[in-house]
């Protein structure tokens, strides 16, 4: 099998991204940080690092980025923090914490640019829902957010735990409803009620990981449109770069076309602007973009 080649340039998204656009979901890697036991290996092909991502930012029109701790590094945040330092003021981190994370640890992580913690309740994840209470306690005290990922078809089972989250939090990857979700079903009703509580956002990212169909992912589009129409102030967007589940060059997404598709599920241009700028500023407590 030939080495994976990632597409990093092309025709820009139409309409163009607004000034201050935030990519809220991606991973980045530097040499010297091997994969750890319990998680997947490092991404295929050449290690996707800061220089590659800067090309993607220029192509798409991204100004700010949230670098999310990858599963390959499990509970060692060293790679993610090094990437944030390399990217400078444009970048912040979502990292792994648990019940052993001290207040001093939290202070150091915050000083290094961390704005959130990750829960990944799927195979290969470092910290799952069983540790949510401890993660939420620390995140809330630090004014961080929590990124939560699990099989969305278990939403009703997890509801009592999710209703207790005090931090701002985001339901990752279009909810990952692997068995699908009816727009008039109980899971959708429960999700909209959770959003209405005021501290939950919904992330448009990695649609191909959640869909049971091929492009244009009509199944995910149907319920994503409902959520976006219900609460346009609660939608955030991410590239999910470098698309770690993709193994072949021929299957590698065109990030501009993928962004056009998923952002097109928002009800209007004002909602698109909010999803790219104001909503992530609220979720991650980012400083607002200064007017020119």
UniProtKB/Swiss-Prot annotation:
Recorded catalytic activity of this chain's protein: D-galactaro-1,5-lactone = D-galactaro-1,4-lactone
Highest rank taxon of the organism: Bacteria
A Pfam family the protein falls into: Amidohydro_2
Keywords, ordered alphabetically: Isomerase
Keyword Transcription appears in the UniProt entry: no
Class of enzymatic activity (EC top level): isomerase
Pathway: Carbohydrate acid metabolism; D-galacturonate degradation via prokaryotic oxidative pathway
Protein family (similarity comment): Belongs to the metallo-dependent hydrolases superfamily.
Role this protein plays: Catalyzes the isomerization of D-galactaro-1,5-lactone to D-galactaro-1,4-lactone. This is a step in the oxidative degradation pathway of D-galacturonate, which allows A.tumefaciens to utilize D-galacturonate as a sole carbon source.
Protein name: D-galactarolactone isomerase
């Amino acid at each position: 099998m030939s080495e994976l080649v990632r597409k990093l340039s092309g025709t820009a998204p139409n309409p163009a991204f607004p000034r201050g656009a935030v990519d809220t979901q991606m991973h980045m890697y530097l040499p010297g940080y091997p994969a750890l036991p319990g998680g997947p290996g490092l991404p295929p092909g050449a290690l996707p690092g800061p220089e590659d991502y800067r090309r993607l930012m220029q192509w798409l029109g991204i100004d700010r980025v949230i670098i999310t701790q990858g599963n390959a590094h499990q509970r060692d945040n060293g790679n993610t923090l090094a990437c944030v330092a390399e990217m400078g003021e444009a970048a912040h981190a979502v990292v792994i914490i648990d019940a052993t994370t001290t207040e001093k640890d939290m202070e150091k992580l915050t000083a290094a640019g961390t704005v959130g913690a990750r829960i990944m309740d799927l195979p290969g994840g470092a910290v799952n829902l069983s540790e949510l209470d401890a993660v939420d306690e620390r995140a809330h005290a630090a004014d961080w957010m929590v990124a939560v990922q699990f099989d969305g078809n278990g939403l009703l089972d997890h509801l009592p735990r999710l209703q207790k989250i005090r931090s701002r939090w985001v339901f990752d990857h279009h909810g990952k409803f692997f068995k699908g979700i009816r727009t008039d079903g109980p899971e959708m009703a429960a999700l909209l009620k959770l959003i209405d509580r005021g501290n939950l956002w919904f992330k448009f990212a990695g649609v191909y990981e959640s869909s049971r169909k091929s492009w244009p992912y009509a199944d995910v589009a149907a319920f994503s449109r409902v959520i976006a129409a219900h609460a346009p102030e609660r939608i955030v967007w991410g590239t999910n770069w470098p698309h770690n589940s993709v193994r072949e060059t021929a299957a590698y997404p065109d990030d501009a076309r993928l962004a056009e598709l998923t952002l097109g599920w928002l009800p209007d241009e004002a909602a698109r602007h909010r999803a790219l700028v104001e909503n992530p500023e609220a979720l991650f407590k980012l400083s607002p973009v200064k007017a020119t």
